[in-house]
Amino acid sequence: MKTAQIRQKFLDYFESKGHTIESSASLIPHNDKTLLFVNAGMVLFKDVFSGVEKRPYMRAVSVQRCVRAGGKHNDLENVGYTARHHTFFEMLGNFSFGDYFKREAIYYAWEFLTKELNLPKEKLWVSVFEEDDEAENIWINEIGFPKNRISRCGTKDNFWQMGDTGPCGPSSEIFYDYGEHIAGGPPGHADEDGDRYIEIWNLVFTQFDKQEDGHLKPLAVPCVDTGMGLERLAAVLQHKNNNYDTDGFQSLVKAIVNLTPKSNNIKNNNASVRVIADHIRSTAFMIVDGVNPSNEGRGYVLRRIIRRGIRHGHKMGIDKVFFYRLAPVLALEFKDAYPELKQALPKVEKVLKREEQRFSQTLDQGMRLLEDAITNLNGSEIDGKTVFKLYDTYGFPIDLTADIARERHLTIDMLGFEFEMTRQRDRARQAGDFKISKKNVDIIGVTEFLGYEQLENISSILALVKNSKLVEEIKAGEYGIVVLAQSSFYAESGGQVGDSGVLSNAKIEFKVDHTNKQKSGVFEHYGVLNKGVLKVGDTIQANVDKKSRKCIARNHSATHLLHAALRIVLGETVTQKGSLVDSEKLRFDFSHDEVITKSDINKIEGMINRKILGNTKVHTDIINIENAKKKDAIALFGEKYSDTVRVLTMGKDDFSVELCGGTHVKQLGDIGLFRITSESGVSAGVRRIEALTGYDAYQFDNQMQNSLSEISQMTKSNNAQVVEKVTQFIKQQKELEEQITIFQKQLTSNQGDDLIGQVQEVRNIKLLSTVVEGSSGKDLRNIADKLKDKLGSAVIVLAVVSNDKVSLVVGVTKDLTKRYQAVKILNYVAEQIGGKGGGRPDMAQGGGTQPEYLAKALASVKSLI
C-alpha cells in the first residue's frame, strides 16, 4: 500500500466514525512560545486539552506535519544512522475531547490496523501503564488480545504529561514484530532497544490534572490523544524494516544518487543519502511555513539542518550547489497532500540555494581547520576552542561538528565550547523562557489593561521574575520581568510591538524594553532595574514612552488604511498574511499573485493620503462578533475571537472596518503622511509592502529629493531630464561591455598562440604547464580548447592568479585520455595549492588558495608524464 493511500485511508476511516478532519497546521505553533516547531499532532489541541479553548466538535482526526530538531524533542543527531529517525515526519492522530475514552480508542485502533490495513494480529504487541488495569482488561477481555503479548511498563514509557503540571495520563502503545531474524525484545524487556519490535501507535488517555505537589487529580472530562508515524506505518505495510526504503523516499533517494559522482561508492554513503533525503523534507516545509535561515530560534534550526545536509553531500563527492535541486522532486512527491509546497517552490529553491552558496564559501576552510585539529590530537576529544571557532567563524553548527567527530570515532569538548559561548551571550537572554502556572495565576491575578484611555497609571507589583524564576526582589543592574496589577503598556499582539517606557517611584527606576502577554492575561514588562531595589507589593508609576506609542499608533492605523486600499485597487481576494507595526515603520504581507505595478502603487498611496487629509475621526466599537460580521468587518484568518470584539472604523463611508485590539490615532490626520518604501515578494502568492508615516515619511521623501538632485548634478541635467539621461548612460555602458567582450575573445585567441612557444616534449608527449598572465579564470577553458585544437595531441595545464586565489584548467586531447586523465592531473596540482576540482577525463577545472606554491606545483606535472 502506497504512503498516499495510507494517509487517505486513515482520514476516511475516522471520518466515518464521526471525526472532523483537521488539515495539517503550519509547523510554526500558533500562539505557543513553549515550542519551536509543531512536534506532534496534539499540539493543535493543547488549549482544548487544558480547558482554555472549546471546539465546535468533540472528535477530530488529522495528519499533521511535524519537525523534531531542537529543544526537548531533537532527533537531528540520529538521522541517517538509524532506520526510523527523522527531522520531518507526518503524524496520524485521532482525538476525543470528552466524548469517547479508552474502550473506543482501543477498538478503533485495533479495527483500523487489523481490518482496514489487514495487519496480521499475531504480528502485534501491546504495552500498557503498569497501574492501568482498565486498559489491559479492555485489550484482553473485549478485544481478545493474548495476555502473553502485553507488557506492563512504568511511567517513563507509558505515562504522558504535557508539562511538570497539568493534563496527563497513562498510554497504551501498539508495536509491530518484524520477526526473529531481527535482534531485539518486546517492550519492557532488557533488549527492547533492538529493531525487532517497533512502536507504530501510541494511545494516550488524558484523565488526570497533575498538581504542583505531584497529586493526580481526576479530570472532569477525560480526553484521548493518539499518534502514529506515517513513515513507520508505511514501512510495516510495504515490508521494509527501514523507513527510507519506502515509496515516499524513493524518488528523493534516486535524485540524490544521480547527483553523486559515478566513481563514488553509494553503498559506503547510505547514511549520507538518508540524511539528505530527510533534511530536504524538513527544510523545504519549514521555508514554506515562513522560516528563513538565521542565527537564532527557528531560523538557526533551519540553518543547522541545511548545512548538515550540504556537508553530507560534499562527503559523497558532490562538489556543486545541489541541495535546492531536490526541492522540485519533493514537491512532486507531495503534490496532492501538500500543494502549498509546489506553490512556494521558487522561494524554497531560492532560500536553499542562497544558504548553500553562503556556507560553501567557508565549508572547505572549516574542514581544513578541523582536519588539522584532528591530525594534531593527543587523545580522542576535539577541544572546545576549535569547536567554537568552527561555529563562530566558519558557520559550523555544533551538531555538524559532532557528526563529523562521531564518524571519526571522536568526541567534542562540550564544556569548553559552552565556556567560549558564554562570552557571547546577551544579558537579555538571562530572563529565559517564563511561564506562570495556572495555580500562580489564580493566586497572583491577571493584569488589567488601561492603555486605550491613558499612557500612565499607578499600580502595585504582583510578581517579579529573574532567571526564569519567581523572585521576591530585583536589584539594580539586574534584568527581569515585572507583572503589574494594572498597566497602560500595550503587550505585543496582532503584529504590533509591545510598549516601552519606565516603571518608577521615588526610590526605583525600571526601564521597560518591551511588553509581552501570556494567554492567561498576565502582562510581562521586560527590562532592567537602573536604580533601587524592586520588591513584590511595591507601588509604582507606570509611564509608557509617549513618543514611541504615538509613532506606533500612526503606523498601525496606516496599516488598516493600506489593507483597505489594497482590496479596492487589487481586488477583494487580498487578505492579510502577516504584519509588523513598530515605532519606525510598518510592514504588511498579503495574498496577491503578481508584482504590483508602479501605477497601482501610486493609486494606493494617493488613496491613503487623501483619507489622511480628510482627517475624519477613528471610531472604536465593542460589539458582538455576529454584528461585526454583518458590518463586513475584516478579521484575520486563523485568529480566534471571543463573542465580543473591538471594531475599528476609519474614513468616510466606512473605508476601513477591521477587528483589532491594537492602539490607534484619534483622527486620521494624526498619521501626517504615508509613503510606500518597498514592494516585494515573500513567497508564492504572498507580497510585502513596507511603508513609513509622519515625520519618517517626510525624511524619506527629503532623502529621495536630495539623491535625485545629486544625480541631476552628476549627469548635468535637471530633475525632469534625469531619467532620460541615466537611460542613455545605461545604453552606452551596454554597448561598451559588448565591445570589451569582443576584445577579450581576440586577446584569448592571441594568448593561445603566444603559449605554444612554451610547450615541452616529455617522453614524446607535448606538455604545456604554465601561468597565463592577464587572463581571468573564465578565459582559461577557451584558451585550453584552442590549444588542444592547435597542438593536436597534448596535456595542457593552465593557471591564473587573481586576488590571492588560483584558477586551474587541465585539458587532455582525446587520444591521450586513456593514459592521462585531466581530473586526476588537476587534483594532483590543486592539492599542492590548498584546493580541489572536478571534471571529465579530457577537461577539468578547479582552484586553490595558496598561490605561493603554484610554480612548484606546475613544475611537478612533468613527473606524471
Curated annotation (Swiss-Prot):
CDD domains tied to this protein: AlaRS_core
HAMAP family according to UniProt: Ala_tRNA_synth_B (MF_00036_B)
MF annotations from Gene Ontology: alanine-tRNA ligase activity; aminoacyl-tRNA deacylase activity; ATP binding; tRNA binding; zinc ion binding
Gene Ontology cellular component terms for the protein in this record: cytosol
Class of enzymatic activity (EC top level): ligase
Domain notes: Consists of three domains; the N-terminal catalytic domain, the editing domain and the C-terminal C-Ala domain. The editing domain removes incorrectly charged amino acids, while the C-Ala domain, along with tRNA(Ala), serves as a bridge to cooperatively bring together the editing and aminoacylation centers thus stimulating deacylation of misacylated tRNAs.
Source organism of the structure: Ruthia magnifica subsp. Calyptogena magnifica
Annotated EC: 6.1.1.7
Chain residues that bind Zn(2+): H556, H560, C660, H664
This protein's UniProt keywords: Aminoacyl-tRNA synthetase, ATP-binding, Cytoplasm, Ligase, Metal-binding, Nucleotide-binding, Protein biosynthesis, RNA-binding, tRNA-binding, Zinc
Catalytic activity from the UniProt record: tRNA(Ala) + L-alanine + ATP = L-alanyl-tRNA(Ala) + AMP + diphosphate
Cellular location(s): Cytoplasm
UniProt-listed Pfam families: DHHA1, tRNA-synt_2c, tRNA_SAD
Protein name stated in the entry: Alanine--tRNA ligase
Needed cofactors: Zn(2+)
Its job: Catalyzes the attachment of alanine to tRNA(Ala) in a two-step reaction: alanine is first activated by ATP to form Ala-AMP and then transferred to the acceptor end of tRNA(Ala). Also edits incorrectly charged Ser-tRNA(Ala) and Gly-tRNA(Ala) via its editing domain.
Endpoints of the signal sequence: none
Keyword Ubl conjugation among UniProt keywords: no
Family note: Belongs to the class-II aminoacyl-tRNA synthetase family.
Record carries keyword Phosphoprotein: no
Cofactor note: Binds 1 zinc ion per subunit.
SUPFAM superfamilies the record matches: Class II aaRS and biotin synthetases (SSF55681), Putative anticodon-binding domain of alanyl-tRNA synthetase (AlaRS) (SSF101353), ThrRS/AlaRS common domain (SSF55186), Translation proteins (SSF50447)
A single GO BP: alanyl-tRNA aminoacylation
